[in-house]
Swiss-Prot record:
InterPro entries: WH2_dom
Record-linked PROSITE patterns: WH2 (PS51082)
Lineage: Viruses, Viruses incertae sedis, Naldaviricetes, Lefavirales, Baculoviridae
Protein name: Protein P78/83
Gene: P61
Keyword Magnesium attached: no
Biased composition (Polar residues): 375-384
Organism: Autographa californica nuclear polyhedrosis virus (AcMNPV)
Protein localization: Host cytoplasm; Host nucleus
Primary localisation category: host cell
Compositionally biased region (Pro residues): 182-221, 271-321
Length: 543
């Protein structure tokens, strides 16, 4: 027993707008009284119209427009899964494993058979599609990218040792607080030559006062303007030049007065009696004393500077401008320019060498640009249009040839003529399509001609010996082939295309579209046939 599910009549009509709907079966499933009255007036595919039937038809149409009419459906619709089957066929083209490709084709053929019968529910078709993608994903997993392994190692570089020294610092700070108060003060040193007392025990880290500012660094003063900074720099330069020749002899003697941090307590020299417990660790050394300020030099007691030696006028530097001249220039806003120094003749680069250097640089840049443009043009995809508008290469492909080969290639990728045949036929067809695909990416005239010859050979290889559309209809009911067997009709149209009978294929498709004007497959094949016919005529006329 089939499971019934209800849906609105409006959504049912939208989903099945490309399918043939039986009127008697449709009105039987609509759950309204008006639909049942209309169904009772259908005799031999003919509706008997009267006043009551017309009123019921108007009421039903109003309910469908307002989305108030519902119906029950038992089977799945073919149009929901048709696009999925087309995508699956395109994916199988890139599979090179023969056994896997054959199993994928068997799954596609089984789904198409169920869709043509129309007695399977959506869940079964969904499971079959899921099985197809499971097989296809396993085929892709077996080929990992080569850079997957180095990328996975990058996150393993971790530096966890950064916060480790934090607890050790805390222990060093707490040890002096526990040991120093219990230790006796050190006795005076027996050395009579050193009058300095032993250093006091260092305070704990928590009791240390903040470090005083360095005496040599003055506090930052208020910001000065440009004139004051210039005057201050001139004064410092004059003081530095005055103190430069002064070298006091007492400086080395005064630099050795700081020896207090090197004194050790007496207990470090005397032997200690053995004890059961280990001796406590010695207290840490006191922090180093701040550097001593430079000794003050008394200029009055310093020896006079050595007498200046007269230099020749050529070796003397130019006199520095006086302070009054600098201030007057700053007030007036005029600044004297320094005289330009003449470059020696040996350092001057001749003009001819400069032009040669510029020409070499431009030539290298133009060559790199040409190489980049050549690479970018070879990477154009087959979907780009107008790719050769700005290409002036002598070997560029003709636009009608490119469109003709692309249309024929698209017919082969979605063809049903060779998908369910023997494995040898499928293997040869897919190998040829795999060879044609890189030729379409680099669209030169040579590659397009090669692709065209390969596709024409493949067309003659997969063409049927007899086309069903050429034989007349047999029987009293002369129904067209697309009504009785749509899958065979698709194969017959593709056979006409592969035999280059584009006009016959176009006539059959136009006739089929009179019955089903919105059918997706009919419109797609008609578009390909028209492209092939037009571009073939252009190619023959240009040749």
């Amino acid at each position: 027993m089939t499971n019934r599910r209800y849906e609105s009549v409006q959504s049912y009509l939208f989903n099945n707008r490309n399918n043939k709907i039986d009127a008697h079966q449709f009105f039987e499933r609509v759950d309204t009284a008006e639909a049942q009255i209309i169904k009772n007036n259908i005799y031999d595919n003919t509706v008997v119209l009267n006043r009551d039937v017309l009123l019921n038809i108007l009421k039903l149409a109003n309910d469908v427009f307002d989305n108030k009419a519902y119906m029950y459906v038992d089977d799945s619709e073919v149009s929901r899964h048709y696009n999925a089957v087309v995508k699956m066929k395109r994916l199988v083209i890139g599979v090179r494993d023969p056994s896997l490709r054959q199993s994928l084709y068997n799954t596609i053929a089984y789904i198409e058979r169920l869709l043509n019968i129309g007695t399977v529910n959506d869940s079964e078709i969904t499971m079959l599609i899921a099985d197809f993608y499971d097989l296809y994903s396993n085929y892709n997993i077996e080929l990992p990218p080569p850079q997957a392994l180095p990328r996975s190692r990058r996150p393993s570089v971790v530096q966890p040792a950064a916060p480790a020294p934090v607890p050790t610092i805390v222990r060093e700070q707490t040890k002096p607080e526990q040991i120093i108060p219990a230790a006796p003060p050190p006795p005076p040193s027996p050395v009579p030559n050193i009058p300095a007392p032993p250093p006091p025990p260092p305070p704990s880290m928590s009791e240390l006062p903040p470090a005083p500012p360095m005496p040599t660094e003055p506090q930052p003063a208020a910001p000065l303007d440009d004139r004051q900074q210039l005057l201050e720099a001139i004064r410092n330069e004059k003081n530095r030049t005055r103190l430069r020749p002064v070298k006091p002899k007492t400086a080395p003697e005064t630099s050795t007065i700081v020896e207090v941090p090197t004194v050790l307590p007496k207990e470090t020299f005397e032997p200690k009696p053995p004890s059961a417990s280990p001796p406590p660790p010695p207290p840490p050394p006191p922090p180093p004393a701040p550097p001593a300020p430079p000794p003050m030099v008394d200029l009055s007691s310093a020896p006079p500077p050595p007498p200046l030696v007269d230099l020749p006028s050529e070796m003397l530097p130019p006199p520095a401008p006086s302070l009054s001249n600098v201030l007057s220039e700053l007030k007036s806003g005029t600044v004297r320019l320094k005289p330009a120094q003449k470059r020696p003749q040996s350092e001057i680069i001749p003009k001819s060498s400069t032009t040669n250097l510029i020409a070499d640089v431009l030539a290298d840049t133009i060559n790199r640009r040409r190489v980049a443009m050549a690479k970018s043009s070879s990477e154009a995809t087959s979907n780009d249009e107008g790719w050769d508008d700005d290409d002036n290469r002598p070997n560029k492909a003709n636009t009608p040839d490119v469109k003709y080969v692309q249309a024929l290639f698209n017919v082969f990728t979605s063809s049903q003529l060779y998908t369910n045949d023997s494995d040898e036929r499928n293997t040869k067809a897919h190998n040829i399509l795999n060879d044609v695909e890189p030729l379409l990416q680099n669209k030169t005239q040579t590659n397009i001609d090669k692709a065209r010859l390969l596709l024409q050979d493949l067309a003659s290889f997969v063409a049927l010996s007899e086309n069903p559309l050429d034989s007349p209809a047999i029987g009293s009911e002369k129904q067209p082939l697309f009504e009785t067997n749509r899958n065979l009709f698709y194969k017959s149209i593709e056979d006409l295309i592969f035999k280059f009978r584009y006009k016959d294929a176009e006539n059959h498709l136009i006739f089929a579209l009179t019955y089903h004007p919105k059918d997706y497959k009919f419109n797609e094949l008609l578009k390909y046939v028209q492209q092939l016919s037009v571009n073939q005529q252009r190619t023959e006329s240009s040749a």
